């Protein structure tokens, strides 16, 4: 048994303007080369664009988008007796949110155009409506898990 104590679980900090943890998680995932101020600029511009497009509370749109993209179940490769099986596993809420944010950012990076704030806002609005690449990714993951349900006992 380990003699070291268990590590305390860190809670995500909230961002300075909206006091929202999801915004801060988004900022930390969009961050490149340590340029956090640029990441904040992109997020805040995207939030303003959402406000202009939908004329509703942009944070509720963000929450709705992340809730819509968050997967309940995923598949994990597990090697059993010389062959690799895709085993469906349940995902916790924190890990699910992290995956959702990663998928949303990936989908918005793939969108055509130059401005990341515009691409991100479009993807978030689409995800809140129930369409877009990130939603398709979630559905694909759920389909994979459903197809490999026979291997669930390998967990």
Curated annotation (Swiss-Prot):
One of its GO terms (molecular function) is rRNA binding. InterPro entries: Ribosomal_uS7, Ribosomal_uS7_bac/org-type, Ribosomal_uS7_CS, Ribosomal_uS7_dom, Ribosomal_uS7_dom_sf. One of its GO terms (biological process) is translation. It comes from the Eukaryota. One of its GO terms (cellular component) is small ribosomal subunit. Keywords: Chloroplast, Plastid, Ribonucleoprotein, Ribosomal protein, RNA-binding, rRNA-binding. Part of the 30S ribosomal subunit. This is Small ribosomal subunit protein uS7c. The lineage of its organism: Eukaryota, Viridiplantae, Streptophyta, Embryophyta, Tracheophyta.
